[in-house]
Amino acid sequence: MTGFKTLWAMAGLLLAAQALAQAPIRNVGVFSLLGDSVQVTASTDAPRDTRIERTARETLEFKDIGFDIIGGRVARKAIETRQPPTLFRLFRAPVPLTLDDQVLIADGAARGELPEWMVRSIVTHQFTHVLLITRARGRASIRTSDGDAIGRGTVEGIGFYLDTLYTMRNQTNGTLSNGLIAPYVEMRVSLMDTDSAKVVAEHRLSEAYALAAKDGSVVADPWNFLSAAEKVHALRQLVEKTLTRGIVAVLP
């Protein structure tokens, strides 16, 4: 991905008169770059084999699933609660961004570098702060109803982790089912002070929980443990809950 600019280089004239100390959050640009894609990671090795990562990955587009809208809504509520009165504006990526693109942008922000389209928006709207919401990559750590943490390899962004071999107990009726589906999120929230072009707070977010087949039903493919509507609801709910925690964590 190209087109990065050092924030000082483009915005220096505008921001030079402002104090270098971290400014109050008066005018914030929220850049939620999550997009609508859903990553499906399927484990293909034995449940206790952690020596080698054997996973298959597939990316699906869930049109209008609204992760960025959720990000904006959560950010507005958190900022208005913690930092009133504050001007607020939400931006989404002009084109879909891959996970690697988003990691590159978040890493660049830590060096005071952002894509040109973001810098132009910062200058135009004279933001005192940027709140950046991106996908991340992390190790699979899936919470089960028994309190265990399972999973092998890595998971990316927002999606579902599938395991066809792990045995899960249904907490409603005690029946056992083979396999699990786990909604998960791996995200990164960064708060950037435009005066200093520095990230002043950052929080990594990792959350996942395992679900068994409903009511002990026999379903060969864990992907079918949830309907399409249930999958959308599970991810939206998890993104909102996790982002709420992350955004509150980076606000002063």
Language-model region placement:
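Bacterial N-terminal signal peptides that target proteins for export
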Residues: 1-9
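Residues embedded in well-ordered secondary-structure elements
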Residues: 8-10, 122, 178-180
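N-terminal signal peptide c-region/cleavage motif recognized by signal peptidases
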Residues: 16-18
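C-terminal/domain-edge helix-coil "capping" segments
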Residues: 22-42, 141, 146-252
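N-terminal segment of the mature soluble domain
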Residues: 44-171, 184-188, 192-202
